[in-house]
Amino acid sequence: MEVCAKWKVPIVITSLGARVELNEAVHAWGGITLHDVIDDRFARKAIEKGADGIIAVAAGAGGHAGRWSPFALIQEIRMWFDGPLILSGAIASGASVLAARAAGADLAYVGSPFIATNEANAPEAYKQAVIDSGAADIVYSDLFTGVHGNYLRSSIANAGLDPDNLAAGSLDMMKFGSEGSGKAKAWRDIWGSGQGIGVIDRTRTAASYVDLLADQYAAAKARICGA
């Protein structure tokens, strides 16, 4: 937070518990906060505690994610909230971005596909795993941090664990760092990823991927609107 305050970061994304004092601090330097939520109850709590907008993390999102359908999540939040609303969860194409907006989101949150870009500070093996994998290769588990999230099956297997027989985690074992002993850790050894990566077939620059999203968005809009 000291670094964010020093540089007056305009948009701060928060997660795993909305905090009044954090929101007030960001507002003091003129910034806004967007809070990750996995259901309507957490969305309401975030706004009550001063968050400016909501990131609705639906089923299929990379890393920590919820179980709700994106349609159910967006529609319940939109019933009472007209502020900034971003949808996250398996969004990897321009058509999916358009679908998010049609469902009621102001913006779409695209994450996992950027792991496979040239600029991403990720191991080459991680990038290749994203390229080689699809929705069937994503495992939803709370073992690694105590909070449910989506991870690449291959990274779990490479850590010597059985992706189909993982023990349950608990909140008192929350560990989000990559430092530590030889035990497998999220996110150093167990790689997060969303279910939308099936469309990622190569590494490319971030700019070219953004251009691709824009082209796909325009094509999908033309297909739906007939223009």
Where do the model's predicted regions map?
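Active-site entrance/lid segments in N-terminal catalytic domains of soluble metabolic enzymes
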Residues: 1-80, 84
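Conserved active-site-proximal phosphate/metal-binding subdomains
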Residues: 70-86, 92-227
